[in-house]
């Protein structure tokens, strides 16, 4: 018998660090991930340590995309209280030891597809 997998959503939220309620600014990195287990573990370590940085953000979220235009499989979002904090993060995160460790562990398991910045104008039921 042929089984077809159905999803109630187009996205599964896999790993979250921090509390992004009320943080209306975000940066999202969309990727094609070839080895989710390695990528997930490296992301979990990096996101837990990134809060130590002054520009570390309020929350980190890793999603798996069930549908997504071509080669998109996962996305990571980092949330902030202001657009200035988001821009500070973008200017500095690549120079941190946390990001260097992430790239060393997961560097061959993902390819960047696109990155974008977002602003929530109104949150409905943020919890």
Residue ranges of predicted features:
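Short S/T/G/P-rich N-terminal loop/turn motif that feeds into the first structured element of a domain
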Residues: 3-99, 107-127
């Amino acid at each position: 018998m042929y089984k077809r997998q159905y999803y109630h959503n187009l996205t599964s939220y896999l790993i979250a660090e921090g509390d992004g309620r009320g943080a209306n600014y975000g940066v999202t990195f969309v990727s094609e991930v070839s080895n989710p287990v390695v990528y997930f573990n490296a992301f979990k370590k990096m996101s837990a340590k990134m809060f130590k940085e002054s520009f570390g953000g309020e929350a980190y979220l890793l999603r798996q995309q069930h549908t997504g235009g071509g080669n998109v499989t996962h996305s990571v979002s980092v949330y902030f209280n202001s657009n200035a904090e988001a821009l500070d993060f973008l200017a500095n995160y690549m120079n941190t030891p946390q990001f260097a460790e992430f790239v060393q562990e997961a560097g061959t398991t993902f390819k960047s597809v696109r990155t974008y910045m977002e602003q929530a104008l109104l949150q409905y039921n943020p919890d």
